C-alpha cells in the first residue's frame, strides 16, 4: 500500500489566506477590523428596522451555491456581512427591541466571549483545563451569594453550580437526575407511571425535557392557572391534580415552578409548592430564567423565598444579566444526583485528578461531553461592573417599564392586562364603545342620541383579540419598534419587555408615541364588521 505524497496534492492558492490559519499578526489585523465593525454596528443600530424585513429564502437567492474555491479577504467578507447578512437580522440589541425577553449584551460579555473563544479549550473535566473548571465553580458561588442562595446550593456549602447552555438543558439534567433517583428506589420498570408537573404558563422547555427524559407524554401536567392568582400556579390546585394522579396509580416525580413566566412574568409561590412537593417526595426545580437576575436586588429577592426547600434553581445570565448567549446558571443541592444520572467514565478519560475525588468534572453535570469556557464571560461581567452597577442596570429597566406602564394606564383606550412585576408590561387596545349589555335588545343610546351595539363578554373578547392582532401587526410593520404577543386567560395581549442594554427612557417614550399614532389610525377607521368574522 503506497503512502500519500502531500506535495502531489497541494493546490495553488491565491495570496489571501495563504498564511497559517492562526497566524498571530493576521489575527491582530483582522481582529481589530471586526472590533471596529461591531463598534460601528452598535453606534448605528438604531438606524436599522428592529425586525428584519426580508422574505423567507432571501439569502439563498443572494449567495453562491458553492463555497469559494480560493480564499477571500476579510474586507470582502465584511462587505457581504453588511449587504447580505445585516438586512436579515432582527436586531435584538436595538434600544427599540421589546419583544420576547431580552438577550442583553455588554462590552464585558462580548470581550469575555472573545477570550473564551480565543483560548478554545475543551473543559470536559478538570484535567482538560483546570482554570476553566475552577473559575466556573468560583463564579457560580459568587453569583449564588449575590442571590443570597443558601449554602446548600454552593460549593462552599454542600451543593454546587454549573453553567449550561439553556434552560431546557438545565431542566433536562435535573429531571434526569430526579427520574433516576426515583427509579433507583421503586424500580426502573415503573418509568411509565412517573408524572411531571408545571402550569399552563410554564415554558415549553419543561415539556420538551420530559419527552427527552422518557416520561410518558400522557403524564405531563400543565396545571391550569387563574387570573385571581395573577396566573401563578396555586399550590392547592397542584395538590388536587397530584391526588388525582395518585388515585390513578401514578407517581408524582417533578414540579417546575417559574419565577417570571414567559407570557406575563407571573411568579409561582415557591414555598407553598415546595410544601406540597415534599409530601410526595418530588423534585422541585425553580425556573427563574428571566426574572432570577433581578433577585440580586434586595427589593426583588422575596420572589425566590422558599428556594431553600427546592432541589435546584436556574436562571439565564444571557437574558437579563448582560452576559451574551449562551449562559444558563444552574445550582443544585445534591450534585451527586446529577453525577449518578449523567456520568460516563471511559478509559481514555481516566486520570489521577478525577480518581482523587478532589475535583469537579463538569462533563458529569451536563448532557454533552465537550463544553465551552462560559465562566470567562460571566467572570468578566461580574468584575467589570460589580454588584452595585449590575443592580442599578436592572433597576433602570424596571423604572423605564414603570414609566411605560404609567403612560398606558393614563390612556383610557388601553388596558393593563396583568400586573407588572418586573420590567415587562402587558397591555391591549380596547375596542370602541366597550360597554356591557344592559338591555334585551342589545343596543344602547348614548347622550348624543347615537345608537351603539352592545356586546356580551365573549363577543367583546373575540373582538378585542382580533383588534389587537391587527394593531400589533401594523405597529411591527413600521420597523421602528418590535413587540410580541401572548394569550393568557383567553386574552390576546401585547408584551412590552424592557431589557436591551442600550434602551433609554427616550426610546420608551418613542415606542409609546408609535403605539398612540397607530391606535389613532386603527380606531379612526374602526369597523366592527371587519373584526367580527
UniProtKB/Swiss-Prot annotation:
Q: Give the range the annotation lists for the signal sequence.
A: none
Reactions listed under catalytic activity:
L-tyrosine + H(+) = tyramine + CO2; L-dopa + H(+) = dopamine + CO2; 5-hydroxy-L-tryptophan + H(+) = serotonin + CO2
Task: Extract the PROSITE patterns matched here.
Answer: DDC_GAD_HDC_YDC
N6-(pyridoxal phosphate)lysine sites (modified residues): 319
The name on file for this protein is: Tyrosine/DOPA decarboxylase 3
Originating organism: Papaver somniferum (Opium poppy)
Q: Does the keyword Lyase apply?
A: yes
- InterPro entries noted in UniProt: Aromatic_deC (IPR010977), PyrdxlP-dep_de-COase (IPR002129), PyrdxlP-dep_Trfase (IPR015424), PyrdxlP-dep_Trfase_major (IPR015421), PyrdxlP-dep_Trfase_small (IPR015422), Pyridoxal-P_BS (IPR021115)
Amino acid at each position: 500500500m503506497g503512502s500519500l505524497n502531500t506535495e502531489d496534492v497541494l493546490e495553488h492558492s491565491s495570496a489571501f489566506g495563504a498564511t497559517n490559519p492562526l497566524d498571530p499578526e493576521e489575527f491582530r489585523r483582522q481582529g481589530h477590523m471586526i472590533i471596529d465593525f461591531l463598534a460601528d454596528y452598535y453606534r448605528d443600530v438604531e438606524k436599522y428596522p428592529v425586525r428584519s424585513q426580508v422574505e423567507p429564502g432571501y439569502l439563498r437567492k443572494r449567495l453562491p451555491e458553492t463555497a469559494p474555491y480560493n480564499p477571500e479577504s476579510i474586507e470582502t467578507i465584511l462587505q457581504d456581512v453588511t449587504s447580505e447578512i445585516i438586512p436579515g437580522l432582527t436586531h435584538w440589541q436595538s434600544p427599540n427591541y421589546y419583544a420576547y425577553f431580552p438577550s442583553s449584551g455588554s462590552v464585558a460579555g462580548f470581550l469575555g466571549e472573545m477570550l473564551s473563544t480565543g483560548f478554545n479549550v475543551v473543559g470536559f473535566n478538570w484535567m482538560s483545563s483546570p482554570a476553566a473548571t475552577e473559575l466556573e465553580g468560583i463564579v457560580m458561588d459568587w453569583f449564588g451569594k449575590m442571590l443570597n442562595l443558601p449554602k446548600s446550593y454552593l460549593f462552599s456549602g454542600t451543593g454546587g453550580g454549573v453553567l449550561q447552555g439553556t434552560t431546557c438543558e438545565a431542566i433536562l439534567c435535573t429531571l434526569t437526575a430526579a427520574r433516576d433517583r426515583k427509579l433507583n428506589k421503586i424500580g426502573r420498570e415503573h418509568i411509565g407511571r412517573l408524572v411531571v408537573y408545571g402550569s399552563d404558563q410554564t415554558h415549553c422547555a419543561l415539556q420538551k425535557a420530559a419527552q427527552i427524559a422518557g416520561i410518558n407524554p400522557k403524564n405531563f401536567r400543565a396545571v391550569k392557572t387563574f387570573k385571581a392568582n395573577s396566573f401563578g400556579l396555586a399550590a392547592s390546585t397542584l395538590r388536587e391534580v397530584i391526588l388525582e394522579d395518585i388515585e390513578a396509580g401514578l407517581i408524582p416525580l417533578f414540579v417546575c415552578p417559574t419565577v417570571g413566566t414567559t407570557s406575563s412574568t407571573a411568579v409561582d409561590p415557591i414555598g407553598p409548592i415546595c410544601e406540597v412537593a415534599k409530601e410526595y417526595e418530588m423534585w422541585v426545580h425553580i425556573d427563574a430564567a428571566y426574572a432570577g437576575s433581578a433577585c440580586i436586588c434586595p427589593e426583588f429577592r422575596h420572589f425566590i423565598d422558599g428556594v431553600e426547600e427546592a432541589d435546584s434553581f436556574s436562571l439565564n445570565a444571557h437574558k437579563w444579566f448582560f452576559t451574551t448567549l449562551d449562559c444558563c446558571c444552574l445550582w443544585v443541592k445534591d450534585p451527586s444526583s446529577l453525577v449518578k444520572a449523567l456520568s460516563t467514565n471511559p478509559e481514555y478519560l481516566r486520570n489521577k485528578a478525577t480518581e482523587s475525588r478532589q475535583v469537579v468534572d463538569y462533563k458529569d453535570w451536563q448532557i454533552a461531553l465537550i463544553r465551552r469556557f462560559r465562566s470567562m464571560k460571566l467572570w468578566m461581567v461580574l468584575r467589570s461592573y460589580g454588584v452595585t452597577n449590575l443592580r442599578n442596570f436592572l433597576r433602570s429597566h424596571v423604572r423605564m417599564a414603570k414609566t411605560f406602564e404609567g403612560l398606558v394606564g393614563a390612556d383610557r383606550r388601553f388596558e393593563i392586562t396583568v400586573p407588572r412585576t418586573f420590567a415587562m408590561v402587558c397591555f391591549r387596545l380596547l375596542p370602541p364603545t366597550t360597554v356591557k349589555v344592559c338591555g334585551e335588545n342589545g343596543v344602547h343610546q348614548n347622550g348624543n342620541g347615537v345608537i351603539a351595539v352592545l356586546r356580551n363578554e365573549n363577543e367583546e373578547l373575540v373582538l378585542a383579540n382580533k383588534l389587537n392582532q391587527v394593531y400589533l401587526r401594523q405597529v411591527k410593520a413600521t420597523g421602528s419598534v418590535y413587540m410580541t404577543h401572548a394569550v393568557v386567560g383567553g386574552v390576546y395581549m401585547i408584551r412590552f419587555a424592557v431589557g436591551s442594554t442600550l434602551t433609554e427612557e427616550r426610546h420608551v417614550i418613542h415606542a409609546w408615541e408609535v403605539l398612540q399614532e397607530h391606535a389613532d389610525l386603527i380606531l379612526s377607521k374602526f369597523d366592527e364588521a371587519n373584526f367580527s368574522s
